[in-house]
């Protein structure tokens, strides 16, 4: 018989840097999950990813206090900032352009995010990422 699901916890945790401090500790502690076990497993799973990249994770907590988790790819905005070399998006995206990104870089992000996005093909995913880039104040070239 399948285990009974108690709850889901959604967090963004830096790759390879999970530790029991907030937000991980309080979120898992109130559900009775072994925090150190999660931190060890998460850090092991994300050891090949660039340290510091925020990784969305969905933790399924079962009624016997055991858990499983799924890691996703970093948010598109984080990948766009990394590839365009900017620190943060523009607060006035219509009038203030703060960086440039080309279509080949957008395609690279779409390929990385392929499993997490709900696009039927790469072109549709690229359009979605272009929208994110425009809202951040990036100019799309090519």
UniProtKB/Swiss-Prot annotation:
Keyword set for this entry? Answer: Methylation, Ribonucleoprotein, Ribosomal protein, RNA-binding, rRNA-binding
Task: Give the Gene Ontology MF terms in alphabetical order.
Answer: large ribosomal subunit rRNA binding; structural constituent of ribosome
Q: Which Pfam families match?
A: Ribosomal_L11, Ribosomal_L11_N
Q: Which GO terms describe its cellular component?
A: cytosolic large ribosomal subunit
Stored PANTHER family = 60S RIBOSOMAL PROTEIN L12, LARGE RIBOSOMAL SUBUNIT PROTEIN UL11M
Assembly and binders: Part of the ribosomal stalk of the 50S ribosomal subunit. Interacts with L10 and the large rRNA to form the base of the stalk. L10 forms an elongated spine to which L12 dimers bind in a sequential fashion forming a multimeric L10(L12)X complex.
Similarity field: Belongs to the universal ribosomal protein uL11 family.
Biological function: Forms part of the ribosomal stalk which helps the ribosome interact with GTP-bound translation factors.
Q: What is this protein called?
A: Large ribosomal subunit protein uL11
What is the protein's species of origin? Buchnera aphidicola subsp. Acyrthosiphon pisum (strain APS) (Acyrthosiphon pisum symbiotic bacterium)
Q: What is the lineage of its organism?
A: Bacteria, Pseudomonadati, Pseudomonadota, Gammaproteobacteria, Enterobacterales
Q: Which gene encodes it?
A: rplK
